[in-house]
Amino acid sequence: MSRVGKKPVPVPSGVTATVTGQTVKVKGSKGELQFVVPSQVVVEFKDGAVSVQPKDQSKQARSLWGTSRAQVANLVEGVSKGFEKKLEITGVGYRAAMAGKALKLSLGYSHDIEYEIPAGITIVTPKPTEIVVSGIDRQRVGQVAAEIREYRGPEPYKGKGVKYAGEFIFRKEGKKK
């Protein structure tokens, strides 16, 4: 029995949810999102909440049950509050700046990296060593943050590179003489 799946997703005021077949559409103040629920799961909207149930007791249906409920909950939270990920840049000369509709990263390479910002995502650089990625789709916000971090991930000796805010970097000791 899925502990996550059995809880219905409450839909707050100001957010409308419609279920058409296997598609859940959620509309809120920040925008509109939709998710196609897998065929092994039944979804319905009643009493101001979206509930998800497995069609049968097969292992696949039960494993998709909690996942589908979490996806629907992310849609509701995304259109009402939105999501954001903060990245920190550590290292001498490492910085980020907005250049029109692109993010310009100086990460110690012989060239600057121009990251084209995808639609539906907002990137802000409050400081040259800080990047804030925000949007309504949790998966896309995380994906964009991961792509930016991938250009120069934190290294274990000095901790230089791009890391998530609050991320612990396992540090190593240098070699001894």
UniProtKB/Swiss-Prot annotation:
SUPFAM superfamilies assigned to the protein according to its UniProt record, in alphabetical order: Ribosomal protein L6
GO function terms (MF aspect): rRNA binding; structural constituent of ribosome
GO CC field: cytosolic large ribosomal subunit
Coiled-coil segments: none
An annotated GO BP: cytoplasmic translation
Alphabetical list of NCBIfam families matching this protein: L6_bact (TIGR03654)
PANTHER family noted in UniProt: 60S/50S RIBOSOMAL PROTEIN L6/L9, LARGE RIBOSOMAL SUBUNIT PROTEIN UL6M
Entry function: This protein binds to the 23S rRNA, and is important in its secondary structure. It is located near the subunit interface in the base of the L7/L12 stalk, and near the tRNA binding site of the peptidyltransferase center.
Family according to the record: Belongs to the universal ribosomal protein uL6 family.
Name this protein carries in UniProt: Large ribosomal subunit protein uL6
Species: Methylorubrum extorquens (strain PA1)
